[in-house]
Swiss-Prot record:
Its EC number is 1.-.-.-. It comes from Botryotinia fuckeliana (strain B05.10). One of its GO terms (cellular component) is membrane. Belongs to the paxM FAD-dependent monooxygenase family. Gene3D superfamilies: FAD/NAD(P)-binding domain (3.50.50.60). This is FAD-dependent monooxygenase BOA8. The keyword Transmembrane helix applies. The keyword Membrane applies.
Amino acid sequence: MFNSTMDIDPHLRVRERMNQRKQSRSIYHSINDKKKTISRPNPSINIAIMTQTSQMKVVIVGGSIAGLTLAHCLSRYGIDYIILERRHDIAPQVGASTWDENGRLLSETDAPILTGKRLGYTITFLERETLLEILYRHLPDKSKVLTGKYVRSIEQDSKEAVVICEDGSRYSGDVIAGADGIHSTIRSEMRRQIAKEGTTKDLEALKRDEIALSAEYSCLFGISKPIPGLEIGHTHRSSGKGASTLLFGGVDGKLYWFLFTKNEERTFGDGIPRYKKGDETNHVAKYMHHHVSGNILLSEVWKNRIVANFVTIEEMENEHWNWNRVACLGDSIHKMTPNLGQGANCAIESAAEMANSLAKALRDDGSKPAIEDINSALSLYHQKRNVRANLIVKAANKFTRVEALATTGDWVASMFIIPRLGDILADRGAKVQVGATKLDCLPMPKRALEGTMPWSTNSGIGKEENRKRRAQLALPLILIALWFFWKKTPEPKGFPVTKTFSEVKLDMLSSIANAIPFATIWTIESYRRGNALTVANIFPTAFLLLAQKLGIELVAPIYFFFHYVQSPQENFAALDNRLTNIAFAKILPLAILSIFLGPSYCIWSSIELESAQWIYDNAWYWYPVYLTMFLRILKFIVKDTTRLNRIYKPTADLSYLRISYSISILICAAFYLYGSLSSSTSIAFLTQELQPPIQPIQAILGAFSELWAAKQTSLYGAAFYWTFLHFADLKFVGKSKQSWLLILTIXLSSTFLAGPGVGLIVMWAWREEIMAKKHVVPE
């Protein structure tokens, strides 16, 4: 992932080295995001030859990553272009950039490797200068790149747009693309024209845009010579109050480092400071004792520096991206802090989207597009990119503040939450990249679909499901719980019927059988990676205890509600997020047998009512606590391979989960059949509910047996409604192709054959199998 472009002192410019690199290097080497479409020219793909008769010409202002990428994209569509670069070098050294493919995002996490397995592209680290050289070298026509062109102003009318340079030269085209960075002349000129021609609504948005540029943080970044203890391929982050560091060990042994610090105050627009040469020395003196990794201090990194620069980190979101024939891209329109490393990736996406949109304005008859067509195309570009880009800007800026411990909440997150969520950065990074823009004229690269999180335009940041909508769909579950609460009555007292000892034991066994499906499923969900920090992950034991105390019919619908709202399929877009903890998965079958069959056998073999009652009250009533303790203790004696399996075998837990589901199904089916054979009707067994401990002298079957049956029907009705909601999710994202007729048939047939508990487990096990398969969304 690329850090945002930063200006550097002219003395740090390096000479143009376009022809000094080996020609075999591929542009794909520089891009970790699988959807990026700029690649080394492929002989199998013909690039349209641009001539003086091209339908459209784009004047690209700025030879930045955004500008050069846009040139590549336009060439694929046969759209003519010219690039005007202010500097005399296309590739000055203005900062370090991406990640090494063997890097570790934190010293104890292998998140970059996981990201590579998910996306199909490993994370690559290289200097921004190198990427610019590669982009330049592979341009079909380098004569279209003009350096030393400082743009002064622009003009546009219904026929063309004109760029006027400081040296008096003029360049006309159908579109002007502003890729000239944070201090964009094109953006300023565009705003000037909006102020003249805009509506009241446009002017209101313009006022907000004019105060959008701000800076609250600064960055001292540079390159240093190798230091013992900082290995090649490793990445180190450190956080402190008001300051954080990021350091990469490059493949050449050099260290690429960043020191992010909070300014004394937030400044806006023209008030943002511009540091001069020498300011970095005074600034770094305050942080010499800051640890960058283990016992290594920033002072040692600074002492070994090769080059360094000190800049203010601007932040900016804009409402206006285009006006008539003018549009901006890259840092000129969406500027973020570099901690998340998404600045250049965002610029590349904007370039691809702008080219896609402009291509839609091309006419079949070869004539030039009208101003209305150009305006519509650029508006489409804004519409498709604005939301996603601004969400990434917000995420990056927030991440900077978390690392700088800006607030108490940021301190808590950085110190206690993030360290316990080793893959949170991999999740954020993959979420940002998986749904990124694709250049429509090129086929999807095979690698983009080979990872465990295949590319999809329906996934990623900005494409999340609406939680309010999910809550509305799950609202009937809360209504069922409220109905049970309002209708809850004391132990029935009317027309008591004394039961035999065998009937009492049957009541106890049916109570155990009724809990097995919920205990099994809820426990599995609590160990699922994609459910991290959800109610299902944090409170499974509490829900099971409340079910024992208040009744499963009251508690289960509440659990179902929270689980459905907090566990959409987007949480499991990566196959490894379906994975459960391997150590837990291995011991769960034994836990089910011990916790459920143990008390059941003791109750069934009891010869005295008092003994059965004691077992029920103690060994069974507190089973959620025993189950949790059993799993937590035995986890330490079983080898946990989750960290490796999440990368190399995300279905490693599946065989163990199948055993657990099968055992639960067999136990529930056996209890169901035993109840059917031991009572005059199987309905009596089906309608048992989890009750408070039965009195040792007699068991009561009150006059409200019909109400109990209704409760059980509603309980499993809620359970199956919850299950069908999740199957609807699977069908919506395309993971399940089965018809609703088949889904309902399996649920009903398994329920009638072996009871509702079996039906519920069968459906959940089926869902497990579907989620374990990789799904590729067709283009």
